[in-house]
Amino acid sequence: MGTWILFACLLGAAFAMPLPPHPGHPGYINFSYEVLTPLKWYQSIRPPYPSYGYEPMGGWLHHQIIPVLSQQHPPTHTLQPHHHIPVVPAQQPVIPQQPMMPVPGQHSMTPIQHHQPNLPPPAQQPYQPQPVQPQPHQPMQPQPPVHPMQPLPPQPPLPPMFPMQPLPPMLPDLTLEAWPSTDKTKREEVD
């Protein structure tokens, strides 16, 4: 353990010592520049790779994959939005219609209708009395929006989440009185 600490100290001292001036380096360089210089030299030796990913397999395999990926990605990106645009709007209206507007003709909705009426009334009952009767002990009052496109009327500010506790009474500023001195000669003078 002691040899590793000694080695680390010597290594740190070697990096901290100034180098004599030679071409390509200033006379006195700090540790960060000395560390970055070999990194820049190493990066200049390496062939330039695309910056979008880490290549663990090496350059020979990565160069073979690049043309295949570059040819496959643009068509898939152009096809995915076309596939997702019709599917997402088709799914979004169907999902809200199940709990909000049950259709009696569809048989697939009937088991959902039996389960759904049990759930929404308990969820809707706490929402309706809260706007009518605000309760002071509940800091948040969730209100269902009537229309998402219609702006809500301004509401009074909610009570704070953590109400302020009354502060203890402050002590009035008292005038400083002279402390009794500990020196015998000064004590005689004060007396």
Swiss-Prot record:
Keywords: Amelogenesis imperfecta, Biomineralization, Disease variant, Extracellular matrix, Phosphoprotein, Repeat, Secreted, Signal. The modification Phosphoserine is found at residue 32. Residues 95-117 have a biased composition (Low complexity). GO terms for biological process: amelogenesis; biomineral tissue development; cell adhesion; chondrocyte differentiation; enamel mineralization; epithelial to mesenchymal transition; odontogenesis of dentin-containing tooth; osteoblast differentiation. Its main location: secreted. It comes from the Eukaryota. Coiled coil: none annotated. It is found in: Secreted, Extracellular space, Extracellular matrix. GO terms for cellular component: basement membrane; cell surface; collagen-containing extracellular matrix; endocytic vesicle; endoplasmic reticulum lumen; extracellular region; protein-containing complex; supramolecular complex. Residues 95-191 are annotated as: Disordered. Phosphorylated by FAM20C in vitro. SMART domains: Amelogenin (SM00818). Residues 1-16 form the signal peptide. GO terms for molecular function: calcium ion binding; growth factor activity; hydroxyapatite binding; identical protein binding; protein homodimerization activity; sodium ion binding; structural constituent of tooth enamel. Interacts with KRT5. Plays a role in biomineralization. Seems to regulate the formation of crystallites during the secretory stage of tooth enamel development. Thought to play a major role in the structural organization and mineralization of developing enamel. It is linked to Amelogenesis imperfecta 1E: An X-linked defect of dental enamel formation. Teeth have only a thin layer of enamel with normal hardness. The thinness of the enamel makes the teeth appear small. Belongs to the amelogenin family. PANTHER family: AMELOGENIN, X ISOFORM, AMELOGENIN, Y ISOFORM. This is Amelogenin, X isoform. The lineage of its organism: Eukaryota, Metazoa, Chordata, Craniata, Vertebrata.
